[in-house]
Amino acid sequence: MAKTRVLLAGLTATLTLGLGANGSFGGPLSFTPSYEQAPTPIIRHNPRDTDASWLNDANVNQTARKYLNKVLRPEGLRVEALLLKPRSAELRFRNGRYNVTPQALGRAARAMANVMPASVSQFVLTPIVDGLPVSSITFQRTDLENFENHPNGTKLSFENAVISDPVTMPQGLQYDPSLYPKFSWSLGPYVEFNHDDLTSSNQYSVRARANAKWNVLPGLSLSGAITKELFGNVSTNTPSTSTLQHVRSDRGLYIERGDPSVETLKADYLFKAAPSIYTRISAGYLERSFGGVSGEVLWKPAAQNWGLGLEVNRVKQRAFGNVFGFQSYEVTTGYASAYFEFKDGISAQLDVGRYLAGDNGATISIDKRFSNGWSAGVFATKSDANVAEDTKTGFRVTIPLNWVMKTPSRTSYDVAFGSTGADAGSRLRLNNRLYDKVREYHRTELYDSWARFWR
């Protein structure tokens, strides 16, 4: 995916484009579309068959992963790890297709019911996001069989499921060895628009972005993005006249002189310090304008509708034209965050702390997420910067690609309008903050979209 930031008359729009090519190291280039198919019916098991002698096979975990992947990979899912016991089995899996999580859970549950031996009466499904186990949803096998065609099966399946925090590393869990280390890449076009206030000119730059990522271990990755202009008219930009440090207002200079540009080049380590505590450490060229070190901790129990977070960054502003160079400006930023999830897809977030220009303040945002993947929200920032732009407001909309293409996809078009070109109240533009990774897999949002479980 490529992100395009559009700046016109002080308003910034961000668009995530789904056009691109991707592949793995040594693999073929692929533009193969996916088409949604009806789910496979659940095969009823014999509850009297409690023989667990199948566990005596030394290769049983490997064999089970093989057959699960045979069923799941056509669905856009992938086995990350598997834990087998005589009466229960835990599947840790990646969801690469469905933007509504319960639909992925439903497909994974059907696969377990049709592959696991009859003695396994309990299934635990644990989605994995960038190496993080984000929640565990436990089903009784008989419930899946009884509720599949029940007229009230959606409600009953949710009420009887148990949503909890995953055990960080349960004994006996076996990972798929082919997943780590793993190299992946993507290539796609994007467009940037810039408005130069001093010359009152509207400018554009059509560019290509190449992304690469090496997943070394679960949660540990090295990644980077390089951009190159294809054509455009972004030129002769003049420095901003803002009295604050130009952390955002000189963005036109980054576009003009950054050709080619190493947009990001960083290492990320995501891990869980406890079942409900998520941690992120990032270092390198974190975004186009800043590089340094970033750390984040999130406390968010899977069955709870609120959470708390803390983020601290020590960064230095990058040079305009020097690919790896820096300017002299350094700053420490940090935020305490509170997250609230209400009924009907409504959520709120409050961030209080220090911004990139050295100003202090708070940001509040409210979003409404719909069961079809759409979302819309508003945000506002107020800081103590003694400038006219000390208040920033805007709104954002997410349009899922599957709404346009009518096929399942996690790709989305994200458009945000607001005064984000101002220096006051500006945060780092990080692409891997923790709450955005775990939110959709926790109880509140699962409940709001559970109607897709049997789809």
For every predicted segment, state its role.
Residues 195-201, 209-211, 252-258, 268, ...:
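Outer-membrane beta-barrel domain signature
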Residues 203-204, 238-246, 299, 325-330, ...:
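Flexible, surface-exposed loop regions and adjacent strand-edge segments
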Residues 196-204, 216, 230-233, 257-263, ...:
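Solvent-exposed loop/turn segments connecting transmembrane beta-strands
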Residues 25-70, 108-111, 116-120, 126-171, ...:
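Flexible, glycine-rich linker and terminal segments associated
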Residues 30, 206-216, 263-273, 292-312, ...:
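Feature captures outer-membrane beta-barrel proteins of Gram-negative bacteria and organelles
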Residues 35, 41-43, 69-92:
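Short edge beta-strands and adjacent turn/loop segments
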Residues 101-178, 213-216, 221-301, 306, ...:
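Outer-membrane beta-barrel channel domains
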Residues 90-95, 185-197, 275-286, 307-315, ...:
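Transmembrane beta-strand segments that form the barrel wall of outer-membrane beta-barrel proteins
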